[in-house]
């Protein structure tokens, strides 16, 4: 059993049901939430047959906290006293049980895939157009509107594609992922239903409060106002594009919890050198300044390096050489190569494809054996000419892989998602053979535990950790993104960079190129990211020679045995 920290013990012993936990990356938030729940149950604050509701955003987070809870609770207590659900799962449960309250059929189709994305593909919308349509639907459906009001709001936008997709949804008698929280909120506006769930759940725990949309906060408050523990970190709020409103959400939570706040400041994940880079960005992110819980345990105090290159080829080669050196000394280590966007990372991707090193691209799904077998066979039978000429590529791929003949729900869902992924890549111009070559077999644990190089973006890396992180593309227009023009956008861009840095345990390298090729092959001069100024003059920031010397002097006998 892990010995709780002082802050974790305080959380366990806090009797009040309303609490705000500010827990930056690597400070033990998940363990603290498990201890919080165990303390509430042991003190009898969740009398049988009432339960604790624990909400998360993703299945991965749900499974992670479930595993932690099982360490602290007897099996019977966990089974009978705890409900762990992601927000869409909770919303689906509420809809199935009470759809009649808002005049809907509880047997409507519940989403198990990105149906709106599939509709955009079927209509052959461009990627930008599909993005705009999905944004229109999301924005409208994050308001407490019934179906008639949604139709009126969409009509007011004049977006014909969004209107047509909504009409198709209603005709198909289905809900989308955007609909689930909307209908759940409408149902919970009925006091009798809200009282039922408030009575069932003696208290609520919310993971990653900074990612809440106003809609999700309203939904939770119908069930647990005044008896909810919110855990998270404003410096990790990077989902504004999905409707999250971290500043507003934090203010409302503070009004609810009052002075009941516990703040973590000790990191157990990252070396002092990495934490210094995170702290440098605190004025931009609004985050808590962090210190290492055990600075002496990190060989050499960790590594933080900055480097610039004439172009992306030299940058990519430097990343490859660094990974080669690390894996030679510590073959069990994991190296995250992260960029703000996948497009900016493509130069590093190409270098690793030819490197002979073990690498994993997080943009691509890791398919189970059966799904991978079907997709490989399907793509092997499609010529580039056919793929380029097919007017409805998504429908063609579904037919070609025999999706309609697959009856197992799990296999069908996995195959449907794989078909959508392949369709997107083919529409981007990749050949069927190139898409086929990107198929990898395994499961989610492959990405979470496999040694080697991991290629990902800042958003997909949130919640993960690597022994080393190399950030490429630290240029204006990339980080911060050139589209970051609205109020608050720059703060969120700084938080994206901070999240990327804080994935690292032993060391982080932040790289930029002076010239970057566009997708069309045109070369553009690039200025360094404005955020790099925060790191200048720091004793912890090493240049290329300083980084080389640190690697040469490092105690790899200690580093090699201290992996994630």
Language-model segments: residues:
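Walker A/P-loop NTP-binding motif
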Residues: 31-46, 224
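A short beta-strand element within the Helicase C-terminal
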Residues: 454-482, 508
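Accessory N-terminal region flanking or inserted into the helicase ATPase core
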Residues: 1-22, 31-32, 51-53, 123-205, ...
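Conserved helicase/translocase motor-coupling segment
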Residues: 315-424, 439-442
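Conserved P-loop NTPase-based nucleic-acid remodeling module centered on helicase motor cores
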Residues: 49-139
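C-terminal accessory regions
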Residues: 426-450, 475-564
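Helicase P-loop NTPase motor core
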Residues: 258-260, 267-359
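Conserved RecA-like helicase ATPase core segment
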Residues: 218-300, 532
């Amino acid at each position: 059993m892990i010995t709780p920290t002082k802050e974790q013990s305080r959380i366990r012993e806090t009797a009040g049901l309303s609490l705000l936990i500010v827990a930056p990356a690597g400070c033990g938030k998940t363990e603290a939430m498990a201890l919080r729940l165990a303390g509430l149950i042991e003190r009898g604050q969740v009398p049988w047959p009432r339960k604790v509701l624990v909400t998360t955003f993703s299945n991965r987070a749900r499974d992670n906290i479930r595993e932690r809870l099982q360490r602290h609770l007897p099996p019977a207590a966990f089974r009978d006293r705890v409900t762990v659900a992601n927000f869409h799962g909770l919303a689906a449960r509420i809809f199935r049980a009470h759809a009649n309250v808002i005049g809907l059929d509880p047997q409507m189709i519940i989403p198990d895939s990105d149906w709106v994305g599939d509709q955009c593909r079927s209509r052959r919308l461009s990627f930008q157009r599909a993005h705009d349509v999905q944004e229109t639907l999301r924005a409208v459906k994050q308001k407490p509107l019934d179906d008639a009001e949604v139709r009126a709001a969409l009509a007011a936008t004049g977006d014909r594609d969004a209107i047509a997709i909504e009409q198709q949804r209603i005709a198909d008698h289905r809900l989308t992922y955007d609909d689930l929280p909307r209908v759940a909120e409408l149902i919970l506006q009925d006091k009798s239903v809200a009282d039922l769930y408030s009575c069932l759940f003696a208290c609520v725990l919310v993971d990653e409060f900074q990612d809440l949309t106003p809609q999700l906060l309203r939904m939770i408050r119908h069930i647990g106002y005044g008896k909810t523990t919110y855990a998270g970190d404003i410096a990790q709020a990077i989902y504004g594009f999905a409707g999250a409103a971290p500043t507003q959400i934090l203010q409302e939570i503070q009004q609810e919890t009052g002075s009941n706040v516990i703040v973590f400041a000790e990191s157990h994940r990252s070396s002092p050198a990495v934490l210094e880079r995170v702290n440098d960005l605190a004025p931009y992110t609004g985050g808590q300044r962090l210190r290492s819980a055990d600075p002496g345990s990190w060989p050499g105090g960790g590594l933080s390096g900055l480097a610039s290159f004439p172009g992306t080829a030299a940058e990519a080669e430097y990343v490859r050489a660094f990974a080669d050196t690390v894996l030679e000394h510590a073959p069990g280590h994991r190296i995250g190569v992260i960029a703000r966007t996948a497009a900016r990372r493509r130069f590093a991707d190409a270098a690793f494809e030819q490197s002979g090193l073990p690498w994993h691209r997080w943009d691509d799904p890791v398919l189970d054996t059966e799904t991978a077998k079907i997709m490989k066979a399907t793509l092997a039978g499609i010529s580039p000419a056919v793929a380029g000429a097919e007017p409805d590529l998504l429908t063609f791929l579904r037919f070609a892989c025999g999706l309609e003949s697959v009856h197992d729900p799990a296999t069908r869902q996995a195959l449907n998602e794989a078909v959508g992924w392949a369709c997107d890549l083919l529409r981007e111009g990749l050949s069927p053979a190139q898409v086929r070559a990107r198929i990898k077999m395994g499961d989610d644990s492959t990405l979470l535990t496999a040694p080697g190089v991991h290629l990902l973006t800042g958003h997909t890396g949130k919640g993960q950790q690597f022994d080393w992180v190399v950030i490429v593309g630290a240029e204006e227009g990339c980080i911060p993104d050139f589209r970051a023009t609205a109020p608050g956008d720059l703060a969120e861009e700084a938080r994206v960079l901070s999240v990327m840095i804080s994935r690292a345990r032993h060391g982080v390298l932040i790289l930029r190129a002076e010239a970057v090729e566009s997708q069309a092959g045109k070369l553009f001069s690039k200025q360094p990211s404005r955020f790099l100024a925060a790191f200048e003059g720091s004793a912890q920031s090493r240049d290329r020679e300083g980084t080389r010397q640190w690697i040469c002097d490092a105690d790899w006998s200690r580093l090699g045995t201290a992996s994630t």
